[in-house]
Amino acid sequence: MKKTIKYSILGVIAGAMLASCETEPETGLVRLTHYATFDLIGGEIYSVPVGGSYSEPGVVCMEGTEDISDKVKTTIYDISGQVVNSIKTDEITFYNVEYSAVNVDGFSSSATRTVFIYNPDVKGSCAGKFDVDMDNTTYNGTPIIEAATKRGYKTSAEVTITELCPGIFYTNDFLAGWYEQMRGIGASYAMYGYFKLNPDNTIDLMYSHVNGWDDGLDYIQNGKWDEETGTLSYESGYAGQIFINPVLKRK
């Protein structure tokens, strides 16, 4: 089973309502059904230094006043959405741990904990809203302003980068808005994903995905964050033929 994860600090998904009503088809009478609710011991966000140890904190699951914690199913997803057997702490990444349960009437609900494996030596942050530097960003070796103008595309774009925990970031578009904003073909063609910031302010790709084509980047290289100028830059390769080297300026 694969789930596409997009900025997946999810919290409690279903269980916002403690109970609801349903009608018995045989009698037309209305009775109360209690959805399972979850109390994540240790919270919805759990951080472990790389190389440290992780022990499942557990969850308390209630159906009304009845404790049904022993009926909870636990599923672990890695950063790409693949189901895995356990959480490993030997590399910087994150996992989503989904807790689900079905109540006596067959209604399911779930909650999710995000477990970050992070580098405590990272002190900087490249989070924020960025303008794409249209003159210095290149598309297949050409300034992207020229490539966009030649094709009649929009000649500006912006990117938002969100810090998930120290050193781990989510971007809404690794491709600097080329398809979604400049070409204007929609949000399904933004290359969202995750990258890590290292203590020396270089960056490395963790995961990327574009829903419209169901694939990701070939690579990111020579990535760096300049705290003084607020500039993030890297070289990216996509589909073996698209080479976009973004230069992003923090607003």
Where would I find each of the regions flagged by the language model?
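Residue-level recognition of well-ordered beta-strand positions that form the cores
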Residues: V60, E98-V102, T114-F116, D131, ...
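Well-ordered beta-strand positions in beta-sheet-rich domains
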Residues: E26, I45, S110-T114, S156-E158, ...
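Short, exposed coil/turn segments at beta-strand boundaries within extracellular/luminal domains
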Residues: V104-A111, G240-I242
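Solvent-exposed, low-complexity, repeat-rich "mucin-like" stalks and linkers
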Residues: H34-D67, T155-A157, C165
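Ser/Thr/Gly/Pro-rich, low-complexity flexible regions
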Residues: D121-K251
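N-terminal helix-cap/turn-to-beta initiation motif at the start of protein domains
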Residues: K88-I92, T114-D131
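Bacterial Sec-dependent N-terminal signal peptides
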Residues: T4-G11, G15-E44, V122, K251
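Serine/threonine-rich, repeat-prone extracellular segments and beta-strand-based repeat modules
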Residues: E66-S108, I117-Y118
